[in-house]
From Swiss-Prot:
Residues 72-86, 172-175, 224-260 are cytoplasmic. This is Phospholipid phosphatase 5. InterPro entries: P_Acid_Pase_2/haloperoxi_sf (IPR036938), P_Acid_Pase_2/haloperoxidase (IPR000326), PA_PP_rel (IPR043216). Belongs to the PA-phosphatase related phosphoesterase family. It comes from Mus musculus (Mouse).
Length: 260
């Protein structure tokens, strides 16, 4: 990949990041809440979360990044592999953030703890006009889909796909070795724990978590496949660009394959 092409790739990610920041600041649609449905949003307002936003972002971003550099260190993968993996992971996370935020703003679904965000004293007005802090109330209208769930799966599912490719979990030479399958599933389990914790914190309904998880996993897989072949491919451990520049005299199995 030339300098111009790399610059264009990075530019796309910068624009997506800016779009993410802008959508973070916009107010959501104020969906009308009927008195008979208030029970859905009357769960306690919990400030101590199992996975605070900062911790979730660290996990979602650093897990795939750590695996990329660990693979390079342990298997002596070339710079092209690491660069393509970083581009794929960053694209998945950036696209996920923009799409998740836009859907949140359009839907404007109240969180399970919205009642106590809207009425901190627990006393609802007859016209249901909120008396709570405006920022807290607006954040309470961003339940669907779950951002924690989508980011967790965007980052950790990508890590799973990357591991599966490097370990050949789904090719003939990698099947039948249970530790490889466990390694592939571990990040997905961690992502599920983060996602489900949002229902325990009363920050999301189960539908928010389910759809958010699906969004994150979809972007993780789509972006992974933009740079890497299918996980059933015998050369799934190599990015497309690396395969294109492979000398015809070199056997595919000689590059970046871990035999255990």
């Amino acid at each position: 990949m030339g300098t111009a092409a790399l610059g264009a790739e990075l530019g796309v990610r910068v624009l997506l990041f800016v779009a993410f920041l802008v959508t973070e600041l916009l107010p959501p649609f104020q969906r009308r809440i009927q008195p008979e449905e208030l029970w859905l949003y009357r769960n306690p307002y919990v400030e101590a979360e199992y996975f605070p936003t900062g911790r979730m972002f660290v996990i979602a971003f650093l897990t795939p990044l750590s695996l990329i550099f660990l693979a390079k260190f342990l298997r002596k993968a070339d710079a092209t592999d690491s660069k393509q993996a970083c581009l794929a992971a960053s694209l998945a996370l950036a696209l996920n953030g923009v799409f998740t935020n836009i859907i949140k703003l359009i839907v404007g679904r109240p969180r399970p703890d919205f009642f106590y965000r809207c009425f901190p004293d627990g006393l609802a007005h007859s016209d249901l006009t909120c008396t709570g802090d405006e920022d807290v109330v607006n954040e309470g209208r961003k339940s669907f889909p779950s951002g924690h769930s989508s980011f967790a799966f965007a980052g950790l599912a990508f890590a799973s796909f990357y591991l599966a490719g490097k370990l050949h979990c789904f090719t003939p030479q990698g099947r039948g070795k249970s530790w490889r399958l466990c390694a592939f599933l571990s990040p997905l389990l961690f992502a599920a724990v983060i996602a489900l914790s949002r229902t325990c914190d009363y920050k999301h309904h189960w539908q928010d978590v389910l759809v958010g998880s699906m969004i994150g996993m979809t972007f993780a897989y789509v972006c992974y496949r933009q740079y890497y072949p299918p996980l059933t491919d015998v050369e799934c451990h190599k990015p497309f660009q690396d395969k294109h520049k492979l000398p015809s005299s070199q056997k595919p199995s000689e590059l970046h394959h871990l035999e255990i």
